[in-house]
């Protein structure tokens, strides 16, 4: 029986990830790379935005396996708030690996109904490409941006992220990295929500880039 192209691509991707996992487990352990500063030091005042920490439950942090994290709500007058989550992994060799929001969101009751990419011009004059999702629970919709950041790269694709993690483990003896996710309700429409997340990301990026090791 012939397999569909989509099925073949799935098995190829699964094989690559399995090989990457085996390789990382069999290689000698590299040092865990600590943040330049704890994520708690990320400014609570970002442009017009003011942040408030929203600690996660201990069991959630344990399941995530993060070395450090911050989970905040940023707000400003007369504007819909933005939720920011950054989870940092000093090493991904021992089973604690970055969990894709694409897999975690359905478990929390939010279903992805639209996906794509967004290109954002950040301070310094360069573009970053991030994942863009619209998620829905009942009649509520939210817009999500997320990306993987570390070792001098900002990556949207999970497969590229795994590739570079293995390559850097071999070349640099490093597997550190962070997941960055920003979310905002779409009660004022998708276009307005997108403008809000793009602006917030542009304001956030320089401060975040100072904390995550290159």
Predicted features, each with a name:
Residues 29-46:
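Alpha-helical transmembrane signal-anchor/signal-peptide segments
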Residues 10, 28, 58-61, 106-107, ...:
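Intrinsically disordered, low-complexity segments enriched in polar/charged residues with Gly/Pro
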Residues 15-16, 42, 197:
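Active-site-proximal structural scaffolding
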Residues 43-75:
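Short extracytoplasmic
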Residues 20, 47-48, 178, 202:
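Active-site-proximal helix/loop capping residues that flank conserved catalytic or ligand/cofactor
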